Amino acid sequence: MAPSLEEPTQIDFNAPLKAAPKLVAPEPEHCPGPESQQAGTADNCAGCPNQAICASAPKGPDPDIPLITARLSSVKHKILVLSGKGGVGKSTFSTMLSHGFSANPDSTVGLMDTDICGPSIPKMMGVEEETIHTTADGWEPVWVSENLGVMSVQFMLPNRDDAVIWRGPKKNGLIKKFLMDVKWGELDFLIVDTPPGTSDEHLSVNSFLKASGVDGAVLVTTPQEVALLDVRKEIDFCRKASIPILGIVENMSGFVCPGCKHESQIFRASTGGARKLAKEENIPFLGAVPLDPRIGMACDYGESFLTAYPDSPACAAIRDVVRRVGVEMGLEADEVLPEE
């Protein structure tokens, strides 16, 4: 029987989570976190209106972390895909990264959609109408192909256009379910697509995966300074959360005419783009993916852009990025994706 969001008695998303203390004021900038071991006792807590509340709240490690670690013990590499701003093509890039890794028949790939309130991965992967099946051992991912599986809240909606209007604890509970109860099996790569910004979903994924280890994050941006501004915040978040940064990708970097293959600069980099930012921040620049209208078409139809349009310069750029991500994780480029 497929799990449903309308069956809270069967799937209690909040049950595994410890109750967060009810604060009387917003958390200050350097707050250690109301559920941390230092809550209410750290130097930064002095003078905070929440100090007594946090100090008396129950503390301790999450008892489900060992279960998550055991479930993911057969996953070799875990990659987070992040973006500071929405609309830069992060989820689109996540699908192409997944298709790129799975183009190697010797690799098995999982794609987890943690954008709980805006799940678009199933549509892009062509499995929007599928549902999750449960077994005695957990939830089965929806398999796009023999070596590419997907998990998303979209599969659990009674109607595909239903809005998911959840606060943080319930979203965190579902993300924990995705990591603890999904039968990912033996994966070479688990790609985690996240919502824009640095919100509850990012904090939850990082805390749940810290024990099992994350290889790193791939940051996606466009050339404009308004996008780079938020990517700088994402870089700061990764460093504060001790998430390794595999590199940055500049998406929509130029426009490729599907007819003549000529590339034009539509979104010009006003301040040097992602390449300059990567140099300033001393992080790897993974590559620039040009804007090809057929990428959007492939996502609308749930097709692999890499398979449908192998002659596109964007396809070559994506394949190169896939190899570079593998190299940043210590793999050989040809081992990740052999040259055609």
Curated annotation (Swiss-Prot):
Subcellular location, record wording: Cytoplasm
Protein name: Cytosolic Fe-S cluster assembly factor NBP35
Keywords, sorted A to Z: 4Fe-4S, ATP-binding, Cytoplasm, Iron, Iron-sulfur, Metal-binding, Nucleotide-binding
Cofactor(s) of this protein: [4Fe-4S] cluster
Keyword DNA damage: no
Any GO MF annotation of the entry: ATP binding
GO cellular component, one term: cytosol
Annotated binding of [4Fe-4S] cluster 2, by residue: 257, 260
UniProt key word Zinc-finger: no
Residues holding ATP: 84-91
Gene (name only): NBP35
The organism's taxonomic lineage, starting at the top: Eukaryota, Fungi, Dikarya, Ascomycota, Pezizomycotina
